Amino acid sequence: MSFYFVQKPFEKYGKTLIEHVNISVEPGEHIAIVGDNGVGKTSLLNEIFKKYEDNAYLMKQDMTVYHDIIAMDYIMSLYPECLTIKKAMQYNYERIADYIALNGYEIEQRILTKAKQFNLTEHDLNQPIGLLSGGQQTKVALLRAVISDKELILLDEPTNHLDQAMLADLVQYMNKSNHTLIYVTHHRGFMNETASHIIEITNQYTRKFIGNYNQYKEIIDLEFQTQVRAYEKHQKEIKELEQTISRVKEWHYTAKQSTSVRDPIEQKRLSKLAQKSKIKATQLTQKRNDTNFEEPEMDDRHFHFNDQDVLRKRNLLRIEHFSMTMNNNPIYENAHFEIKNGENILLTGPNGSGKSLLIDIIRQRLIPDIGKVHITPSLKIGYFDQQNNNLDYDETPLNMVLDLEGMNRSHAQTILASFGFNQYKIVHAIADLSMGEKSRLQFVLLFFSNPHLLILDEPTNYFDIATQNLIMKMVQSFNGQVFIVTHDVYMQSQFKATHWEVRNKQLHNLSLKQDKKLNVNDTLRLLDDYKAIDENGHFETDN
């Protein structure tokens, strides 16, 4: 069936988000929705779902509210009667017959079979969702969407936290799917591989384009260049118009001054010329003032960071011969990791391999079962949290930015405006912001708190593409060091760093060349480091 959604205006909490929404979707179309953070993409998905609830399934991006629920139970909740009987069977075996009658075991088997396509084990499905990695949580949400088997599937940020292998599997699934798919994503590569159409959302309208993201971008770029040429032409016309106005005013002044001549015929002619010149000048001035042609905007925002205390240590941190087990599952075994002064870090690896766990060790939230952690005592770490747990939802964006050291009101407003926060949003509760806006605010707080080391865990998940480009500019101009965990291939290609990969319970430095020749100076520095080894073979604590 076809799906239509028309609303004028499109509002949320009494506030107009989009002046005019007009969306038509044909059966089997795979549509990616693009637009700035806070424009209403998630709200639009919710409203479409409400209209077509009997024929649609909505995969939500935030799994926090389900953290205490067993993953299998979350999926089985699609069949509430089955789930109720399944739980009752733990205490009353007589309900087994009812469970069989409802095809409960067949549903479970179907879930387990589909789970294999998402690299989810039965053990994973029997865990509370909160104990799963961000990528595994996304897989569970996607699995539930697939099991629902609705005609229209709405996906909110389906690529978040997914490793490259799972992303490739998702691309394959979507390209084979006969379902009608509408999804919000900021992943350019994913849109290029899966989208048959793009819907662009602005505060004024929605527009539908045939093709993937690159094809959409070509059209938008062409439109922008056309607008630039039209603006330049208009500016030239305005300049010529102003020159004409100046000449006409000069004629009027000259004619008026000359009306005192004695020849009555010449006096009449000059008086008439003065009057006409005055009228013409007024008309031309009105034409200039009535012309409203705004200069096309380009995304070219730049930021400068305050100087930081210089750290003199050769190694900011070092974790030696460490092992770690979580829920009886070994994550690391005799692994090694270090961050050298002046070195940026890119960390990759499959979902559930231990990337977030390593961050928790670096942030001293966890201690390895075995091994020793050396961190420069004066090291100031800034951490970007996937769940925005660092935000006070009752506060306003402006107040939180003003709490930063050395921040004044004018500077805070300028920074927030550069990140797309208007005067209304900066003075209202953070709880009312979209997920993307909350992430943007967290970035502002993180970058302008001047840490020595920025740890960014999946920084592009909730950002529109313009903000992603801005973030990369900020990272490249940052005075300190940056540690990024990302599955985004585009960001990986743009970020110059030492590349570490989590694989087979080890951390591998992919930037090391196996055929590297011996460097005498490097070797001497290493020997100096080894002088600090104690009798147990561990590095002594840095002072």
Task: Outline where the language-model segments fall.
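Flexible nucleotide-interacting loop at or near the entrance of a catalytic core
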Residues: 96-106, 224-330
